[in-house]
Amino acid sequence: MQQQIGIFEAIVLGFVQGITEYFPISSTAHLRVVPALLGWADPGTAYSAVIQLGSLLAVLTYFYKDLVEILSGTVRALRTGDTQSREVRLFWGIILGTIPIVIAGLALKSTLEAPGSPLRALSVIAVASIVMAALLWLSESLGKRTRTMKGIRVIDGILIGCAQALALVPGVSRSGSTLTAALFLGFQRADGARFSFLLAIPAIFLSGLLELKVLVDEGFSGGIGPIVAGFVSSTVFSYLAIAWLLKFLQTRSTLVFVIYRFFFGALLLGLLAAGLLPDIEPVRQALNLP
């Protein structure tokens, strides 16, 4: 069921979505946690997925030239028979890399959207944030960072796509899991992030389109205004986040995000243990939280 959301709340949630979708810190987690901290209702998976379409518009705009090159290069390769061109490898890497999250998403859809789903519990988000922080740190420590987009293989896309499927669990982070996988595979940070963002396009599109249908069927019970406000806010801040992060990763490591994720997860666990944040009832009882 769609929650009632005001214009101001929508703009704030769009800002949160835009900044956190492409930073490796989990947009879904922050869209769940920020409302809880501010005393707002959980916007739900449908609204969250629809404002992700703003993030989709941003990445399509930012990578417009890349996408044109990939598509035109693939069409050209079909004519010439050059199946090993960079554009063809990127194309199939993105297409095949999207399959794991589609399969997992369909399998878990009812669980993720069920009222009081344990997967949307704040305690789950906290643990996922800490675990992914550790994995991101390991990928920074062990990754060789010698590979670029020029040498990407289709199998790289599939492996990174499998990592993307983990992001269905709030707190994992789509960009976090895919960037971590890319670093483990030896990619340079900025190149890993670029492929991560390109790989996100089909997944965000399919997810947002599916949930948009849900909101249309419900007749926009929360009003069209908050949806538009959240979409515009998400678009603007997503574009800024993409541009900033790619420039940042050219010279810096992801350590700042590792530290943030550790503290974010630890803070959540502390607030839950102190009874200052409510968790989903079955999880709260299982963990004996106040």
From Swiss-Prot:
Record membrane topology: Multi-pass membrane protein
Compartments, record wording: Cell inner membrane
Residues that span the membrane, as ranges: 5-25, 44-64, 88-108, 122-142, 152-172, 195-215, 226-246, 255-275
GO cellular component, one term: plasma membrane
Family: Belongs to the UppP family.
Other comments on record: Bacitracin is thought to be involved in the inhibition of peptidoglycan synthesis by sequestering undecaprenyl diphosphate, thereby reducing the pool of lipid carrier available.
Protein name (Swiss-Prot/TrEMBL): Undecaprenyl-diphosphatase
Organism: Gloeobacter violaceus (strain ATCC 29082 / PCC 7421)
